Amino acid sequence: MTFVASVELSLFRFEIDGLGLPPHGAVGVGNIVAKKGSRMPAQRWAIRIETDDGARGEYVTHWVGTPSSFAQATMLAPHLLGCDPDRREEIWQDLRREVRAYDHMGHGPLDIALWDLAGKRRNVSVTRLLGGFKTRLPTYASSYHGQEESGGLDTPRAFADYAAACRARGFAGFKIHGWHNGDAAREAATVLAVRKAVGDGWPLMLDPASQLRTWRDALYVGEACDEACFFWYEDPYRDTGGAVEGHKRLRERLRTPLLVCEHVRGLEAKAAFVLGGGGDLIHADPEYDMGITGAMKIANFCQALGLDLQYHACGPAHRAVMAATPNTHFYEMALIGPDMPNSVPPVYACAYSDQPQDLGSDGCVSVPDGPGLGVEVDLEKLAKFTVK
């Protein structure tokens, strides 16, 4: 039997031109702002699993690459030693139990690396292992959050202008991430301004990222989404996406479909949410939802109910699961803005990219078809960035 002989985790740092943090300096996905001439420090982590016969599986984290998830992965990694790497379901069940008292955010990258290993050992792509059938993925532009500082996405008009530019560039749709102060009037004004700028018929989405302060604010902004014929409305208010009853009552009052459960972890919890009437579309993420194994469980559950699924964020694992999922619409290029590059780690030695300038002329990104996840990590660059 082949077994896992070693698991290596590495924490690395890099800098991104043109981005920065607001005056308070707190690090977080929603706190990134446009700062001309600035270089924003960023941190991610990577994992490498090696078997006794020398085969390797790798993964570089994107949006899940936080210090807390790194700590969880450090807790979990020793449990892989000596395991048969092909028994992914058994490993998945064991790791899920091991971090049952936590948020599971360190689990996904380990599972993804096991899938990468499985593909490389068989010289086939993860997409093929999953039965994937898509080679091109329609991609929407997912904006950075609105900022109070001058520059970037600082007004409803700035959002409208950027959305129009994204439509002209060929994106399949556009998602607004609004401001952090919960100003429902400004959020609704942005919704209407963006629709006016891009015209009818092009898919628009809104994700307030749980910043609207009350259910009534969420209803008010949702009514603007109805007026503007939005494709979906996502995680609107300060329940942080967890209140089934609140979302059920929003659904009763709004026409715009609710996309829910980005911050509800795992199959059972998401199933309970949607069966309780809390949403129309379900969010899943192979990084957040305990790997490719966990994400595909959620996709299959949604398909059994005849519901659609959306994958959150971007990355090679996200492309693989989307390629194998019939009941989904768009790939999310998150996050981007005017002269604001995506903050995904620049560690690929191949053509893989989640930057807007590399969107295909057909408004799609390609699904990697090489062995494993189909991407080549620049090990020399990764070693240069590594700090732990």
PLM regions and their residue ranges:
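Structured beta-strand/loop patches that form or line metal/cofactor-binding pockets in enzymes
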Residues: 1-58, 62, 346-350
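Metal- or metallocofactor-binding catalytic centers and their adjacent structured scaffolds
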Residues: 10, 50-122
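Shared catalytic-loop signature of beta/alpha-barrel
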Residues: 27, 78, 223, 229, ...
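Conserved, mostly hydrophobic/aromatic
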Residues: 54, 76, 110, 123, ...
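Hydrophobic faces of well-ordered beta-strands that scaffold small-molecule active sites
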Residues: 59, 139-142, 172-176, 204-208, ...
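Glycine-rich, aromatic-flanked loop segments that form ligand/cofactor-binding clefts
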Residues: 105, 111-151
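Metal-dependent enolase-superfamily TIM-barrel catalytic cores that perform enediolate-based chemistry
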Residues: 136-254
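Extended hydrophobic packing segments that form well-structured cores
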Residues: 369-388
